[in-house]
Curated annotation (Swiss-Prot):
GO cellular component, one term: large ribosomal subunit
Identification of the protein by name: Large ribosomal subunit protein uL2
Organism whose genome encodes this protein: Histophilus somni (strain 129Pt)
Compositionally biased region (Basic residues): 253-263
Protein task: One of the primary rRNA binding proteins. Required for association of the 30S and 50S subunits to form the 70S ribosome, for tRNA binding and peptide bond formation. It has been suggested to have peptidyltransferase activity; this is somewhat controversial. Makes several contacts with the 16S rRNA in the 70S ribosome.
Annotated region (Disordered), positions in chain: 221-263
Subunit and partners: Part of the 50S ribosomal subunit. Forms a bridge to the 30S subunit in the 70S ribosome.
Length: 273
């Protein structure tokens, strides 16, 4: 993994910082595990914008990732690491002993030729997946399930991890990167180690066009709009004289947005700022 700063041959290249990983596969992805990914432009079936700042971008294939890791007690070998345009983490193509291939999230320290395994008897080793009741307290894990059998939902982006800090009865207590501590059933499956490509946060795109390649459209400030378009719009000068709000009038500084009361009892400590 190398961090490369580009030479300032133009204004668009001057600030570019790239993450170069020579271990990544340079050929095409594994075709049977590709899916069609159609663009919406942020619009719903009525043609109305439901998510702003989406549109354009390079055509992409979706890589079908195995978040469930439910091929139990069958050893697999890592064939290669690959780039995935749909996520910040890299992915690994693994070949199981029965001949099936699957994509998984590539943990930090995993490389081509390594062996991995899933199941309750899997050893505590990077890339192995097993129920958290069989993982020692203090271990670092990723791709953590919230419901048994549903597949990993927590800690899937580049550099993400969760620490198991306690085990009581049928539950384990996890400490998330945000500072939140929550309980999860010990039957839920997690993968040992942290997600790789943690240098992703250091990259600098360098120009607006690089964001457009990724399908991200510009974000216009509310104060630069007219009163019809945003609560902050209009007026002479830059002051809007009220608390900052979203375009729909909802407070935007510190207002709590969580509404899932049903699972509040599993949160031991809320995330910090």
């Amino acid at each position: 993994m190398a961090i490369v700063k580009c030479k300032p041959t133009s204004a668009g290249r001057r600030h570019v910082v790239k993450i170069v990983n020579p271990e990544l596969h340079k050929g095409k992805p594994y075709a049977p595990l590709l899916g069609i990914k159609s663009k919406t432009g942020g619009r719903n079936n009525l043609g109305r914008i439901t998510t702003r700042h989406i549109g354009g971008g390079h055509k992409q294939h979706y890589r079908v990732i195995d978040f469930k890791r439910n091929k139990l007690d069958i050893p697999a070998v890592v064939e290669r690491l690959e780039y995935d345009p749909n996520r910040s983490a890299n992915i690994a193509l693994v070949l199981y002993k029965d001949g099936e291939r699957r994509y998984i999230l590539a943990p930090k320290g995993l490389s081509a030729g390594d062996q991995i395994q899933s199941g309750i008897n899997a050893p505590i080793k990077i890339g192995n997946s097993l129920p958290m009741r069989n993982i020692p307290v203090g271990s670092t894990v990723h791709n953590v399930e919230l419901k048994p059998g549903k597949g990993g939902q927590i800690a899937r982006s580049a550099g993400a991890y969760v620490q198991i800090i306690a085990r009581e009865g049928n539950y384990v207590t996890l400490r998330l990167r945000s500072g939140e501590m929550r309980k999860v059933l010990s039957e839920c499956v997690a993968t040992i180690g942290e997600v790789g490509n943690s240098e992703h946060m250091l990259r600098v795109l360098g120009k607006a066009g690089a964001n457009r390649w990724r399908g991200v459209r510009p974000t216009v400030r509310g104060t630069a709009m007219n009163p019809v378009d945003h609560p902050h719009g209009g007026g002479e000068g830059r002051n809007f004289g009220k608390h900052p709000v979203t375009p729909w009038g909802v407070q935007t500084k510190g207002k709590k947005t969580r509404h899932n009361k049903r699972t509040d009892k599993y949160i031991v400590r809320r995330r910090g700022k």
